[in-house]
């Protein structure tokens, strides 16, 4: 599947973000199309993660416009929770719930937010765990998983909401080098399947592989 230039999934215009007097993002404008994989590179402290977090308004926006799937995130009338249901996010440190097993982590959002039945949510969770090569870990707890396995579960958990867009914030930087490949493989398959992806990283080789 290729990039659909007729469908802008994310439109950013003159985006500004300040932390107090510190200007982190200055007049950023871009369009991200359906099926496109955009890799954001740069050294630590250059505003990569801040930009990513503005795309689902986990960071408040100082100025400019961010439109996701036709919804203006700077408009007070926009239901941010509804928009976020269609934007999956994978964090550097996995952010799994340690008190829930893998299946519990996978089923929580679809059941609570999308009102899926437990049977539906379980079926989809098992399908996604199989897709990321972790079907046998459904009953395991996060403490029993390696870093690479945790990140693959985190990706599968985000996919459980059936998002149109996936945001990745430094998805491999907390992993041991030998575990990077297994996460990269899942992301490459997502890209091949036509998922719209925005990936923040400082690893050039990783960026070349995914982008």
Residue ranges and their predicted role:
Residues 5-211:
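ABC family nucleotide-binding domain
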């Amino acid at each position: 599947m290729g990039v659909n230039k007729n469908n802008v999934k994310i439109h950013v215009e003159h985006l500004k973000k300040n932390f107090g007097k510190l200007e982190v993002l200055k007049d950023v404008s871009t369009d991200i199309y359906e099926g496109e994989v955009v890799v954001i590179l740069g050294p630590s402290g250059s505003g990569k993660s801040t930009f990513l977090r503005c795309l689902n308004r986990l960071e408040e926006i100082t100025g400019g416009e961010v439109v996701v799937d036709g919804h203006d995130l700077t408009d007070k009338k926009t239901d941010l929770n509804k928009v976020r249901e269609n934007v999956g996010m994978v964090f550097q440190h996995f952010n799994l719930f340690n008190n829930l097993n893998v299946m519990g982590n996978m089923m929580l959002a679809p059941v609570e937010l999308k009102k899926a039945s437990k049977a539906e949510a379980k079926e989809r969770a098992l399908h996604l765990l199989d897709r990321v090569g972790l079907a046998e870990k459904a009953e395991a707890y996060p403490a029993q998983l390696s870093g690479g396995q945790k990140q693959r579960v985190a990706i599968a958990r985000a996919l459980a909401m059936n998002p149109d867009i996936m945001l990745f914030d430094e998805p491999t930087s907390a992993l041991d080098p030998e575990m990077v490949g297994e996460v990269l493989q899942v992301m490459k398959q997502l890209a091949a399947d036509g998922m719209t992806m925005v990936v923040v990283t400082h690893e050039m080789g990783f960026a070349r592989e995914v982008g």
